[in-house]
Amino acid sequence: MTMNELKKAFAAKLLNIKAIKLQPENPFTWASGWKSPFYCDNRKTLSYPTLRSFVKLELAHAVLEHFPEATAVAGVATGAIAQGALVADELNLPFCYVRSKPKDHGMQNLIEGTLPEGAKVVVVEDLISTGGSSLKAVDALRKAGFEVVGMVASYTYGFPIAEQAFREAGVRLVTLTDYEHVVAQARETGYIKEEDVEVLHAWRKDPAIWKK
């Protein structure tokens, strides 16, 4: 299937398991501090064996197609640990995961797992919002001496601030679906109402100041 067909198909699957939540009156607060009427809980895909396998295979396919030089996989904690491990298993590659900060006990590791020296790493992420935590993981891997060849993720909001951050960091991002495809599919199927679309449009215009 084409990339556009994949994005539409995966968007439909996310809606089917009710992974998309809309709460304009009681907005979600993200780690970045932004308020959002919209939340994509794509970790729910792990609970459905057929869908879990779909995500694993499509992410693995994305790695093979776009980053064939990868010799290892790293997941971003905590959301992408499971997805990253599944992809690494499918590709038969070494795996590690990157914490948001070092453990405060034991080995105090930031990177958990052992990769070959100089490994070419593809990073697996579950969701991209501002890109901050994802690129923090990239930075940790680079400082540890690994080459980051790119990143694959299940979903992105496609914010300009994130796209700019990825460009500046020199990281290519490939995702299975995105905000535009999910909202279009939700609108087409009646998952959201027209007034909801207006709220989402207002939020998407300037999410940093929405509801402040």
Question: Which residues make up each language-model segment?
Answer:
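Phosphate/pyrophosphate-binding loops at sites that engage ATP/ADP/AMP, CoA/4′-phosphopantetheine
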Residues: 59-71, 141-144
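PRPP-dependent phosphoribosyltransferase catalytic core
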Residues: 2-16, 139-212
